[in-house]
């Protein structure tokens, strides 16, 4: 496995899952290395000295950090199969815009839903539902955010679906009631082997979130 790309990751991380999905969508074999956040590996600290976070993709001895950056790198490093971006500049710009929306609006809100309580949780739930509705509107009647093909925005968002059950359990609401098209989209994405092999079982995520809440709230 010496010549394979190395992915430094942590199993429940929706950001790490993005890298897994991207690599598998391209058919790239890689070495998966699980990180222990209480004892980060020398390779992680050396590869990402600024943020010291996963995911990090080490390819040809060079580290690529930050999940969306990793996804874009994978698309450019292995261009032969399943392009993640449209061919036109406007389409690519729109894809980057919506992936950025997921990172800036969706990420913070979803954490408040499962990782907070009281007023902060309720505020997060409101933000989450608003973000979900905006994303559903952008999806429209398309099979994927990229149109007919699974792409960059889909990869940026689908990994959160492994957490949907945890959001519903701890936030006490139904995502499908709020956004049926988004749930249908998530099920469509899960039919792809690159996605189904990369996302952990939702019950494991619920147990992980419950343990976090027990220890931190």
From Swiss-Prot:
Keywords, A to Z, come to: Cytoplasm, Detoxification, Growth regulation, Nucleus, Transferase
Q: Where is the GST N-terminal domain?
A: 3-82
Catalytic function, reaction form: RX + glutathione = an S-substituted glutathione + a halide anion + H(+)
Upregulating conditions: Induced by a gravistimulation.
- What Gene Ontology cellular component terms go with this record? apoplast; chloroplast; cytoplasm; cytosol; mitochondrion; nucleus
Q: Name one GO biological process term.
A: glutathione metabolic process
The family database entries (CDD domains) matched by this protein are listed as:
GST_C_Tau (cd03185), GST_N_Tau (cd03058)
Residues given in the record as glutathione binding sites: 13, 54, 67
Q: Give the E.C. number(s).
A: 2.5.1.18
Tissue expression: Mostly associated with vascular tissues, especially near hydathodes.
- The family this protein is said to belong to: Belongs to the GST superfamily. Tau family.
Q: Tell me the function of this protein.
A: Exhibits glutathione-dependent thiol transferase activities. Can use glutathione (GSH) and 1-chloro-2,4-dinitrobenzene (CDNB) as substrates. Involved in the regulation of far-red light influence on development. Regulator of the interplay between light and JA signaling by increasing JAR1/FIN219 efficiency. Maybe involved in gravitropic signal transduction.
Which protein are we looking at?
Glutathione S-transferase U20
The root-end lineage is: Eukaryota, Viridiplantae, Streptophyta, Embryophyta, Tracheophyta
